[in-house]
């Protein structure tokens, strides 16, 4: 499923392709690209839930906005998000790429993935997808994109 999400994000969203693609056509394109039907269905459902945030149909948990509060992760969250992922989320909050609400959206979308393996690089892409879909997060998206591609480009040299 995560591979389908990455393909969709890179092909349609990140490259600013036509976003209003017919779902049947999109499913055909993904099937033609070699993706499994169940993975396609799960990825589209995942994106639908993400779009609910954009449309205001879903809201993250109501959170205390005390700047001194600290996020305690559940066992399930710790199993999916290792220490480096949790540290990266904290870092993004500290530099104000994420706020309490967008952090919770990211965590919720990570937990909704049906993948056995999940690492820091995967988390960065989920963060980009979430920020891209939330109105008013354009600057945060741009900062996150710079962080992601700046680090990756530096690794190539």
From Swiss-Prot:
Domain of life: Bacteria
InterPro entries registered for this protein in UniProt: Smg (IPR007456)
One protein family per Pfam: DUF494
Coiled-coil intervals: none
Similarity annotation: Belongs to the Smg family.
Protein name as catalogued: Protein Smg
Organism from which the protein derives: Salmonella typhimurium (strain LT2 / SGSC1412 / ATCC 700720)
């Amino acid at each position: 499923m995560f591979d389908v999400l990455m393909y969709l994000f890179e092909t349609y969203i990140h490259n600013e392709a036509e976003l209003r693609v017919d779902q049947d056509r999109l499913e055909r394109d993904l099937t033609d690209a070699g993706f499994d039907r169940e993975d396609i269905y799960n990825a589209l459902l995942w994106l639908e839930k993400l779009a609910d945030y954009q449309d205001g149909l879903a809201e993250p948990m109501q959170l205390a906005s005390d700047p001194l509060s600290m996020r305690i992760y559940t066992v399930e969250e710790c199993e999916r998000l290792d220490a480096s992922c949790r540290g990266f989320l904290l870092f993004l909050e500290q530099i104000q790429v994420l706020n309490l609400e967008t952090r919770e959206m990211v965590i919720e979308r990570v937990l909704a993935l049906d993948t056995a393996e999940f690492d820091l690089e995967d988390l960065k892409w989920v963060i980009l997808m979430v920020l891209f879909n939330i109105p008013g997060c354009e600057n945060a998206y741009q900062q996150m994109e710079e962080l992601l591609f700046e680090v990756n480009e530096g690794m190539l040299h």
